[in-house]
């Protein structure tokens, strides 16, 4: 039996220019708890909507990437959107990602990929064709994001700001690793010093690695000191985070520091971000991971 109400279902269709950031966008929606499908053929959209309708609360938030593959694909998508309007029980929001031609060409050169519509291999040819095909769809979009001057992180933050707000999930937990030798992070709300934990730096095989590597992670986490510390830290943060959110704070920066910001702090920052991601929107940054002492 269907228990969905129209206002309970959120369907976002992500489309736009090739190279404008649809991959980053769909990953951002996944982090927001959306059920995501990449490159769903428009001909399957009506059946997919029925599945949504019958799934009760299991598919109440869905994001679909609809890429352009040619005129036939585009015509099918427009027809599917018209059919959705006739259904009456769902109103999708269309997010159109765009960027200027110069930026799109630059991105194609960086990735060494060819534009899907460019028959001669020249990106500008495909870009011009795509703009023409997408003109009507862009006109239907409720939101148009110009990503020309946005880095992937900034696009992610923009999507979160727009779509998390409507869900009441505006509280963001930013977890940052850093090295004390490079100074304290000036934007940190909470700072935890993990220099008391056993240091993988002194094991030659792990020195060039970081806390993103499994060998280092396992080494750091195997010690009883680490396990007791993480247990107490999670208990403390589980108490504090709801209070910060209740007070109206939009984001919290938790900084985890070790000596150089390579091993222990990276491991613990990843651990915290992973632990709290089901309750909050979390984002992890490793401030000093690219810095290496030169001797």
UniProtKB/Swiss-Prot annotation:
GO terms for molecular function: ATP binding; GTP binding. Disulfide bonds: none annotated. It comes from the Bacteria. ATP binds at residues 16-23. Keywords: ATP-binding, GTP-binding, Nucleotide-binding. Pfam families: PapZ_C, RapZ-like_N. InterPro entries: P-loop_NTPase (IPR027417), RapZ-like (IPR005337), RapZ-like_N (IPR053930), RapZ_C (IPR053931). GTP binds at residues 67-70. Displays ATPase and GTPase activities. Belongs to the RapZ-like family. This is Nucleotide-binding protein BPUM_3115. It comes from Bacillus pumilus (strain SAFR-032).
């Amino acid at each position: 039996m269907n228990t969905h109400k129209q206002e309970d279902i959120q369907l976002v269709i992500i489309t736009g220019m090739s190279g404008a950031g649809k991959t980053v966008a769909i990953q951002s929606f996944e982090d927001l708890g959306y059920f995501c499908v990449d490159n769903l053929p428009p001909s399957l959209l009506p059946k997919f909507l029925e599945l949504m309708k019958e799934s009760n609360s299991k598919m109440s938030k869905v994001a679909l990437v609809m890429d352009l593959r040619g005129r036939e694909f585009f015509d099918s998508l427009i027809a599917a959107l018209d059919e959705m309007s006739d259904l009456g029980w769902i109103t999708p929001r269309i997010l159109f990602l765009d960027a200027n031609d110069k930026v799109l060409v630059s991105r194609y050169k960086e990735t060494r990929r060819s534009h899907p519509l460019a028959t001669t291999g020249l990106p500008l040819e495909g870009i011009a064709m795509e703009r023409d095909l997408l003109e009507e769809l862009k006109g239907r979009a409720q939101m148009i994001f110009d990503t020309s001057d946005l880095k992937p992180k900034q696009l992610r933050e923009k999507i979160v700001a727009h779509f998390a707000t409507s869900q009441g999930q505006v509280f963001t937990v930013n977890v940052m690793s850093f090295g004390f030798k490079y100074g304290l992070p000036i934007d940190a709300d909470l700072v935890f010093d993990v220099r008391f934990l056993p240091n993988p730096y002194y094991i030659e095989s792990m020195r060039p690695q970081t806390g993103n590597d499994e060998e280092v992670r396992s080494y750091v986490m195997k010690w009883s000191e680490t396990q007791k510390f993480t247990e107490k830290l999670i208990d403390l943060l589980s108490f504090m985070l709801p209070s910060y959110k209740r007070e109206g704070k939009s984001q919290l920066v938790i900084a985890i520091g070790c000596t150089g910001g390579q091993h222990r702090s990276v491991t613990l920052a990843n651990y915290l971000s992973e632990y709290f991601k089901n309750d909050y929107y979390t984002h992890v940054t490793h401030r000093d991971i690219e810095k290496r002492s030169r001797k």
